[in-house]
Amino acid sequence: MSRTKKTRRITDIMPARKADKKPEQPKLSGGKNRKSTRYELDAKAREEKKKRKHKGLPTGSRNVDPAEQKKAAVKEVKDPRIGSRKKIPLMVEFVNKPEKGQIIKPVAMEEYKPHLSPELELEQLENNEILNQLLDEIEAGKTLSAKDQKFVDECLDRIDELMTELGIQDEDEDNGDALLRQFETMDINQFR
């Protein structure tokens, strides 16, 4: 069954709406050249004023320049981000989410080591004030913290590597080896 739009019919029971009433026209009696009375002119002016009042035109429509009309015709490009209904996550999680059963291995960062010539690096390590101060404390019999001891060990190991790379031999090591050999070969009975 098709639907039909219901219309409001004016009957005797219903009150008449303002829009349904037709304005009463004053009856003109007499000749064509007869002047309207003051009351007729007022009624006519009131009707015209009502018509003007309810036209619905925007204010100042008479004063619009044609150049401004062209500008108004060009639509401004709206930013598509404004007024979006799509929900945006506030916290980004699982940017590189692996497939099920797969694991993304973390990439190890390589430490950057400045490439100095071995001679320069050895000279810098030998002239390192902090290292020299820590070595003096060790010779004095003080105990170092774990962090300082690790630093001293790393520096001394690097010095040894650089010296073997450059072919430099420490004089103290030769004397120590000679003394060790002398001690091992010595006859202990001589000192009794």
Curated annotation (Swiss-Prot):
One of its GO terms (molecular function) is GTPase activator activity. Residues 1-80 are annotated as: Disordered. One of its GO terms (biological process) is ribosome biogenesis. It holds the Pfam family YihI. Residues 9-25, 37-48, 65-80 have a biased composition (Basic and acidic residues). Keywords: GTPase activation, Ribosome biogenesis. Belongs to the YihI family. Interacts with Der. This is Der GTPase-activating protein YihI. It comes from Actinobacillus pleuropneumoniae serotype 5b (strain L20).
